[in-house]
Amino acid sequence: MFKRKSAPKIRLLFVDENNDLQSNIAEYFVKEMYGDLYEVSSAGPKSDCVDCELISVMYQLGYDIRSYTSMDFGHEDLPKGFDYVIFLEKSTYDRVKDDIPFKAPQILHDFGRKENFEKATDDVELYECIKQLVENVGEWCKSTFEDPEALKTMVV
């Protein structure tokens, strides 16, 4: 007869430098795994195209991010309020943590940048590097966001 009002979703913002790599992976996995718990966005201090190799590798793995777009912090489609801002690159965190336009607790988990792919000498090795990043971010998302209360313990 009466519907119980559900708790509001926790609002997350995933950040990497250009909103082109690991922030999109994290956004995808948290939406897929825990969309009932979280409202998820991603952005960066700068925007670029979402990494083409990432889109291709994720699609080959069965994860479709072809509709994702890169946004900077000032993008008009980016929500304005967040419960947590989650940096996925230490270098970006160190550079902008005090100047971001969002006043929310910050979490840092460093997955590095594309420089980690420099060891790839051909397309097969590049595929494996990106696949490993996707798997690492996916596993981290699975374990990290399962319990929303645990986020409080990760704030830096």
Language-model regions, residue ranges each:
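Phosphate-binding/catalytic loops
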Residues: 96-156
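Structural signal for conserved beta-strand scaffold positions within catalytic alpha/beta enzyme cores
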Residues: 42, 87, 107-110
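Mid-chain, well-packed structural core segment of small domains
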Residues: 78-101
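Residue-level detector of flexible, active-site-proximal loop/helix-junction positions
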Residues: 47-49, 92, 112-115
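Conserved active-site segments centered on acidic
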Residues: 1-78
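Short glycine-/acidic-enriched loop or helix-start segments at secondary-structure transitions
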Residues: 24-26, 52, 93-99, 118
